[in-house]
Curated annotation (Swiss-Prot):
Gene3D superfamilies: 3.40.50.20, ATP-grasp fold, A domain (3.30.1490.20), ATP-grasp fold, B domain (3.30.470.20)
Any one of the GO BP annotations: 'de novo' IMP biosynthetic process
Cleaved signal peptide residues: none
Tagged with keyword Transferase: no
Name of the molecule in the record: Formate-dependent phosphoribosylglycinamide formyltransferase
Amino acid sequence: MTRIGTPLSPTATRVLLCGCGELGKEVVIELQRLGVEVIAVDRYANAPAMQVAHRSHVVNMLDGVALRAVIEAEKPHYIVPEIEAIATATLVELENEGFNVVPTARATQLTMNREGIRRLAAEELDLPTSPYHFADTFEDYAKAVADVGYPCVVKPVMSSSGKGQSLLRSDADLQKSWDYAQEGGRAGKGRVIVEGFIDFEYEITLLTVRHVGGTTFLEPVGHRQEKGDYQESWQPQAMSPKALAESQRVAKAVTDALGGRGLFGVELFVKGDQVWFSEVSPRPHDTGLVTLISQDLSQFALHARAILGLPIPVVRQFGPSASAVILPEGQSQQTSFANLGAALSEPDTAIRLFGKPEINGTRRMGVCLARDESVELARAKATRASQAVKVEF
């Protein structure tokens, strides 16, 4: 039975969040609504989730010693990773010592890099994926490309938001794609995955919740990417019954193998009735921001309930919905957003401004949300709202 105490008292139920971006911010808000004491940790000050947590610490989360020191001092009941770039070996040690890592330390370790999760899906679970090879050197990479054939995709095994990812169509792309992957990798130069290109019709995120009552699948989320970054998402994505059933089968197999409780974002490629596994995040997904307007319980509310062992008897869908990012380019530590009245002038629209403390280049600073009679109308409405927002530096 779940018991939640009083924040900032000896009975408090404490959650320590590792990573404090816009997704973590929404998770903190949902935990706050349930009376949880939240400690936010990230590598820079005033990150979005820190602004709504009870307190925060600035720590390099790839530094296992520093991360352990904060966790041992705070003694949280739950450790909730919000990003991949964490000293996962330290999380494994802490879990073995009795700390509760969400969903599990193994899940955070396997999904920290593309190799662990790809080998689990393809080699252990025998799920359909694109053909792939891993490579550490340019020579091995060139051989992997020759084996996989053109067109193919190269990605660093460790990166986020599509950084370092590119499509190769001929030998002319070999060197520049290698260089781009090396620049985009989170740990600097290093290992890459070369994948055969799947001629898919569309890609989806199947948000999957493992909770005290079993597994719940949300309506499939369609999305559009540019340079590996999500630009817009919508729900529900139209699919054949066979493709939806296969997507749920694949998602359940992967999330069961990772274990624990929480929300997972399972990324899949779809063509007709065929489905291929791509990646999985053991946490809320950026494309799932659409659930802030599409459902009675957003992906963040569902994650909070699942973590705390609270039931999820039903999730109600409100109708066709979409999200469109606010993605300015500039340099500032005092960004302002204007023309919000125009952006919110249509019915069934909403805006989330993330409160990121600075921008240096292109950065996702907010998202516009919309609901309408069809996905097409919702997408158009969300895009109009996003384009109406004026970002001032």
